[in-house]
Amino acid sequence: MYPENYEKFEKIIERLREFKGVIIVEGKRDEDSLRKLGVQTEILRLSRSSLADVALLASEHEEVMILTDFDETGEKLAKRLYDLLVGLTKVDMETRRELQFIASKDAKGIEDLYDLWESLRLRFWAPKEGD
């Protein structure tokens, strides 16, 4: 990842930390990764309930962010969730698209974001010897 993409990645991570709605992820490792990144908002896991149940719970919030993995299954889940939620609440798919564009070569999904962030932070922003 190039330094300019790292800066974009950092801005997305900051947006995740500041997000006030509910975030939908696929599983526990995805949630754990987001928590390590400092995300404190409510997170719903698809592994805990049916797609329809998660969509129903999410629709009770003013804004929903869909963060499924970047593989084919994640794409299909994101589309199905969007179709269920659009018109019921504000749905953020853009953050997932941005993450996919910037990080998909280095991360297969949401569960990899913390490790990617940590390695990039050390690579691009670690103090140089003598500082």
From Swiss-Prot:
SMART domains, per database record: TOPRIM (SM00493)
Cofactor binding annotation: Binds two Mg(2+) per subunit.
Residue span, Toprim domain: 20-103
Keywords: Magnesium, Metal-binding
Co-factor requirement: Mg(2+)
GO molecular function, one term: metal ion binding
Binding site for Mg(2+) 1: 26, 69
InterPro entries for the chain: TOPRIM_dom, TOPRIM_RNase_M5-like, UPF0292
Assigned protein family: Belongs to the UPF0292 family.
Protein's recorded name: UPF0292 protein PF1724
Organism of derivation: Pyrococcus furiosus (strain ATCC 43587 / DSM 3638 / JCM 8422 / Vc1)
